[in-house]
């Protein structure tokens, strides 16, 4: 190193760099900056061995020492140097440590701000595992006769006990309103046997739920339908037709039953189960008249070509 600066080439290099050293020393008004320039002048090859800007990762390389100069954060600027630690001062270490901490905290704050600017709708957003606060949560409790539309409204319906059809009760903003409307309609149709969503509201007066409650009265059209259903007779047209058919079949069978015994009575007379006079007449007609026994007559009545009955009888 001495040969490099002490030789002929070293002298020429020092002479060439002398104007730059003078301009730097005259422009610096701070005494700390002037002392740093003296240290920088004592190491002329520092311009060739390292860059002239601050390297935030200079602390990762222990083989290089650092020289601090004033900056906007702590009043000093750090330049890497390849010389020993004889140029280091305690205040330079403190300023360098403060500057590195400032850079680290600033980087973390910038990352936090960037994460806050990213919205969940953007494609680069990564969802965290676990329950999210922005997701729409389903209701914890489902009510009888209540269902939700896809746009968020709630609908109440009740199944009629006779023809098993659904009666629409209305559209509501909340599930509780729809459940209460179902309870009113169910109590009107089924009375005390109705299964309600709010059994605790059954009902201090012993009648149907109060229509002047928190959620307002039932719609007039729905109430009219319920009254019409209650006013209908219990037997529906389909059931009356079935009962009339059954009655007609029973009457036809009862009309056919008396004619059957008459036919059996006629057949009974022919079988001999009738009156005694008829039995006697039948027996007389069936019996043949008795003829007196006569051997000659009998033998002559039955001639034979093999036997000469005339010679036998003579």
Curated annotation (Swiss-Prot):
One of its GO terms (biological process) is response to water. Its main location: nucleus. One of its GO terms (cellular component) is nucleus. It is found in: Nucleus. Signal peptide: none annotated. The keyword Transcription regulation applies. It holds the Pfam family AP2. GO terms for molecular function: DNA-binding transcription factor activity; transcription cis-regulatory region binding. Disulfide bonds: none annotated. Keywords: Activator, DNA-binding, Ethylene signaling pathway, Nucleus, Transcription, Transcription regulation. Belongs to the AP2/ERF transcription factor family. ERF subfamily. This is Ethylene-responsive transcription factor ERF055. It comes from Arabidopsis thaliana (Mouse-ear cress). The gene is ERF055.
């Amino acid at each position: 190193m001495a040969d490099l600066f002490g030789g002929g080439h070293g002298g020429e290099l020092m002479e060439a760099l002398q104007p730059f050293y003078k301009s730097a020393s005259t422009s610096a008004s701070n005494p700390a900056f002037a002392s740093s320039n003296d240290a920088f002048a004592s190491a002329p090859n520092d311009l060739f061995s390292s860059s002239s800007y601050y390297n935030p990762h200079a602390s990762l390389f222990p083989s290089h020492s650092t020289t601090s100069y004033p900056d906007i954060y702590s009043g000093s600027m750090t330049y890497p140097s390849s010389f020993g630690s004889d140029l280091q001062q305690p205040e330079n270490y403190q300023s360098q440590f403060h500057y590195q901490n400032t850079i680290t905290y600033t980087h973390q704050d910038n990352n936090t701000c960037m994460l806050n600017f990213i919205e969940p709708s953007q494609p680069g957003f990564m969802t965290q595992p676990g329950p999210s606060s922005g997701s729409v949560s389903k209701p914890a409790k489902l009510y009888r006769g209540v269902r939700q539309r896809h746009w968020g409204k709630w609908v109440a319906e009740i199944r009629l006990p006779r023809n098993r059809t659904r009666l629409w009760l209305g559209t509501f903003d909340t599930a509780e309103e729809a459940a209460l409307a179902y309870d009113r309609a169910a109590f009107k149709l089924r009375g005390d046997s109705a299964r309600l969503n709010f059994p605790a509201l059954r009902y201090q007066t012993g009648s149907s739920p109060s229509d002047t409650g928190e959620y307002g009265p039932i719609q007039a059209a729905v109430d009219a339908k319920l009254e019409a259903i209650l006013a209908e007779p219990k037997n529906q047209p389909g059931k009356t037709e079935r009962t009339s058919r059954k009655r007609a079949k029973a009457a036809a069978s009862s009309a056919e039953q008396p004619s059957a015994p008459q036919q059996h009575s006629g057949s009974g007379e022919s079988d001999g189960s009738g009156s005694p006079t008829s039995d006697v007449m039948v027996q007389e007609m069936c019996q043949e008249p008795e003829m007196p026994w006569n051997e000659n007559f009998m033998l002559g009545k039955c001639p034979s070509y093999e036997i000469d009955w005339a010679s036998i009888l003579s």
